[in-house]
Design a protein with these regions (language model features):
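Intrinsically disordered, low-complexity terminal regions enriched in charged/polar residues
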Residues: 119-168
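Conserved catalytic cores of phosphodiester-cleaving nucleases, focusing on short active-site segments
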Residues: 32, 60-82
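Acidic-basic catalytic patches of nuclease active cores, encompassing PD-(D/E)XK
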Residues: 1-51
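Nucleic-acid nuclease catalytic cores
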Residues: 100-128
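A structural signal for short, well-ordered beta-strand segments and their strand-loop junctions
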Residues: 41, 73, 108-111
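Charged, often glycine-rich, active-site loop that binds/positions anionic groups
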Residues: 49-62
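Short, solvent-exposed loop/turn segments at secondary-structure junctions
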Residues: 46-48, 79-81, 114-116
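Mg2+/Mn2+-dependent nuclease catalytic core
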Residues: 79-102
Length: 168
């Protein structure tokens, strides 16, 4: 006999957190504009994902064209740096991994200061592959120590940050 599907309550995001996220995305866009790089904001409505992939894929916020290199993707987050590091939601990371795999793109989290300061951190999605999941509250999370993230100042040129991010 087939078990009935149990619907989980949707996670409600605090409006203040939504506003901080929008401010972080705007700050990142202004920084990209100053770099004079081709980039696109990816519209986030549910209709921009094919029906069979809804709930399985997450779109990044920006696609950035690097002349002579190709396309990279950024998911911008307003993040608080905790003593243990940066905390990511496992379900969101898994959905971004699906995006990265299907589109053959390198995806970064651009973790901007939740208070609007110039300090930010880049975390390439694959840096989270070996991070153990830990339950916090009602969801599984990944905590990346801050020294494993790449510090980026929004006052420095994008090109310098990008070169550091791909250096071996």
């Amino acid at each position: 006999m087939k078990k009935p599907r149990v619907r989980r309550a949707r996670h409600v995001v605090d409006p203040a957190d939504i506003a901080k996220g929008a401010q972080a995305e705007q700050a990142f866009r202004i920084w990209l504009d100053s770099a004079v790089l081709p980039h696109m904001y990816v519209e986030q409505s549910p209709l921009t994902v094919p029906a069979p992939l809804r709930g399985q894929i997450k779109r990044p916020d920006y696609l950035v064209g690097i002349p002579g290199v190709g396309l990279i993707a950024f998911d911008v987050k307003a993040k608080t740096v905790y003593p243990e590091g940066l905390i990511f939601d496992v379900a969101e990371v898994q959905k971004l991994r699906t995006f990265a795999r299907l589109f053959h793109l390198t995806v970064y989290f651009a973790c901007l200061d939740s208070e609007g300061g110039p300090q930010s951190y880049w975390v390439r999605l694959d840096r989270l592959d070996d991070v153990p999941a830990v339950r916090r509250g009602g969801c599984l999370t990944l905590t990346l120590p801050i020294d494993a993230a790449m510090p980026v100042l929004l006052t420095e040129p994008f090109s310098l940050a990008f070169v550091r991010s791909v250096a071996l």
